[in-house]
Curated annotation (Swiss-Prot):
Names of the cofactor(s): Mg(2+)
Protein name: Probable GTP-binding protein EngB
Keywords of this entry: Cell cycle, Cell division, GTP-binding, Magnesium, Metal-binding, Nucleotide-binding, Septation
Species the sequence originates in: Burkholderia ambifaria (strain MC40-6)
SUPFAM superfamilies recorded: P-loop containing nucleoside triphosphate hydrolases
Gene responsible for this protein: engB
Binding site for Mg(2+): 39, 61
Length: 219
């Protein structure tokens, strides 16, 4: 999948549900608070510097951006960059539009096979992060959390952040949530967790390939 993600290109941008592309390829959505490092993480995962753009004004971008991955003639999946959330100075009308767009997309998009949720490792699981989770968990599809900027933490702080976030996610399972809720440390700067994230996305997009890799080789 690393090589597959490295074949990523801009596909389209969407501001209304009616404009979502009529594609059939599986989609992986990326969500996170403004300044959680979402655009940087996407660029590192795709081995590009300027694929996903971060607005200089947090909360300014309110569009859904699509990036196709795989061969240009026959893309095998789409990465979907959702608008960042949580910036206090965004006008009320923009917040309402963001809430409608994201909640409807996450709840109803049949092509969506999983959600990558970006959280700053220094302050994970805010109320808005929980809202994103609660919009998506009814689908039964997996959510994988990247605790970004973990290079800014000490080893013990990283352990605590990982443990506390997993505990928060486990609470949803105790409520009967069926989809997988997993978490890992990630640093775009140090490339920490890059291989793990690649492998997980591969298992979502091409589960048959991932299953073959996990099967023991016959002797």
């Amino acid at each position: 999948m690393a090589f597959l993600l490295h074949q990523a290109r801009f596909y389209t941008t969407v501001n209304h549900l009616r404009d979502l592309p009529p594609t059939v390829q599986p989609e992986i959505a990326f969500a996170g608070r403004s300044n959680a490092g979402k655009s940087t993480a996407i660029n590192v995962l795709c081995n590009q510097k300027r694929l996903a753009f971060a607005s200089k004004t947090p909360g300014r971008t309110q569009h859904i951006n699509y990036f196709s991955v795989g061969p240009a003639a026959e893309p095998v999946a789409n990465l979907v960059d959702l608008p960042g959330y949580g910036y206090a100075e965004v006008p009320g009308a923009a917040k309402a539009h963001w809430e409608m767009l994201l909640s409807s997309y996450l709840a109803t998009r049949s092509q969506l096979c999983g959600l990558i949720l970006m959280m700053d490792s220094r302050r994970p699981l805010t109320d808005l992060d929980r809202r994103m989770i609660e919009w998506f968990v009814p689908t039964g599809k997996p959510i994988h959390t990247l605790l970004t900027k973990c290079d800014k933490l000490t080893r013990q702080e990283s352990i605590n952040a990982l443990r506390n976030t997993q505990k928060g996610l486990d609470a949803y399972r105790e409520q009967g949530v069926k989809g997988k809720l997993t978490v890992q440390l990630f640093s775009a700067l140090k490339r920490t967790g890059l291989d793990e994230a690649h492998e997980l996305i591969e298992s979502w997009v091409r589960p048959s390939v991932a299953d073959e890799k996990s099967e023991p080789v016959a002797q």
